[in-house]
Amino acid sequence: MKKGNMIYEGKAKKIFATDNPDLVIQEFKDDASAFNALKKGTILGKGVVNNEVSCHLFSHLAGLGIENHFVEKLSEREMLCKKLEIIKAEVVMRNIAAGSLVKRYGLQEAQVLPFPIAELYLKDDALGDPLMNDAHAVAMGIASAEEIQFVKQEASKVNAALQVFFLERGLKLVDFKLEFGRHNGKILLGDEISPDTCRLWDAETMKKLDKDRFRFDLGDVEEAYIEVRHRVLGN
């Protein structure tokens, strides 16, 4: 597989073309950002951890029948993926109150929600990725009502599967962000699943093992990412 020109660079990843128009290479960076890029920094080795964790979790989900863009791991920082037309609606699944949910509604942090909540956010850095509802997404032409319904159903399946997966490894899946895209007439799960996109707490101590350690200057950021990698991969 020949690596071509870079076709996109985001805050945490670069996307490269390949000699196959249906496939791209996703490369993970050590760059870190928070609060809509108002805070920036570097987490040493983050790209390696996020690539390895994402590869493992995408493979696990595929084995459960949840289709996604992952094809194969190419290197410690790179994965080969199906090229998606990204849907500009991010899905956040929430199981435990944390982050913006606490701030927005005055909930107690760590309050277990009676059922998982699915939220939609407009994928737009300039606007700060605002919260939106299904009607907004359809009215703005982001996706059809049927596509939004499918994306939410898939997100719920991913949530159920990952809650079990992480709990078996001593981690609570507090909340996480998912992105989806279109590929050859199908909607597939894309992007990444990692400590960058998931809030993960130790099931016993409730220690935060994710990007919140960077966001709020909690220290031991690299160690937290390595711990998640160790638990996910088992080595």
UniProtKB/Swiss-Prot annotation:
InterPro entries registered for this protein in UniProt: SAICAR_synt/ADE2_N, SAICAR_synt_PurC, SAICAR_synth, SAICAR_synthetase, SAICAR_synthetase_CS
Keyword Nucleotide-binding: yes
This protein's UniProt keywords: ATP-binding, Ligase, Nucleotide-binding, Purine biosynthesis
A GO BP entry: cobalamin biosynthetic process
Pfam family, one: SAICAR_synt
CDD domains given in the database record: SAICAR_synt_PurC
Record PROSITE patterns: SAICAR_SYNTHETASE_2 (PS01058)
EC number(s) per entry: 6.3.2.6
GO MF term set: ATP binding; phosphoribosylaminoimidazolesuccinocarboxamide synthase activity
Reaction(s) this enzyme catalyzes, per UniProt: 5-amino-1-(5-phospho-D-ribosyl)imidazole-4-carboxylate + L-aspartate + ATP = (2S)-2-[5-amino-1-(5-phospho-beta-D-ribosyl)imidazole-4-carboxamido]succinate + ADP + phosphate + 2 H(+)
The family this protein is said to belong to: Belongs to the SAICAR synthetase family.
Protein name in UniProt: Phosphoribosylaminoimidazole-succinocarboxamide synthase
Lineage: Bacteria, Pseudomonadati, Chlorobiota, Chlorobiia, Chlorobiales
